[in-house]
Amino acid sequence: MKRRHAIEFTLACAASVMFIGAMALLDEVPTPRYVFWPWVWLALITPVLEALCFRGLVQTELRQRFDRQFGPISAANLLTSAAFVALHWAQNPKAWVGLVVIPSLVYGYFRDRYDSVKSPIALHLLHNMLYFSLFGLPP
């Protein structure tokens, strides 16, 4: 991993920890329910599948069609993040959905910047593992 990539990746990991901390400050914190296999599915398998689908397929296809950039954020990243947030809209407390936007844009940034889904997968894994370890499974 090149130095710049390592620094950006470390900052993204730190941001993920901060976003999980921000979620803890909200009033709508779910009651933890620890069940091993659902935790494995939600914390480990789902982030890989979502990253492959959204970053590997959707964002890659949109990137080929839309070449527009808004600073470091591509139009493909914005559109993919909108779809990602919409997917999470029905599954989460509404106050938390806004906190999905920034991590999604970060995952997309790494997809665009390094032309790989490895970093988005690793970041999404970290995010979900922290989230479900701290807050448990949804009821």
Regions flagged by a language model, labelled:
Residues M1-K2:
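Short, Lys/Arg-rich, polar N-terminal cytosolic tail immediately upstream
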Residues H5-T10, F70-S74:
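Short acidic/polar alpha-helix capping motifs at helix-coil junctions
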Residues I7-L26:
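Hydrophobic core of alpha-helical transmembrane segments in multi-pass integral membrane proteins
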Residues F19-A24, R33-P139:
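Transmembrane helix-loop-helix hairpins at the membrane interface
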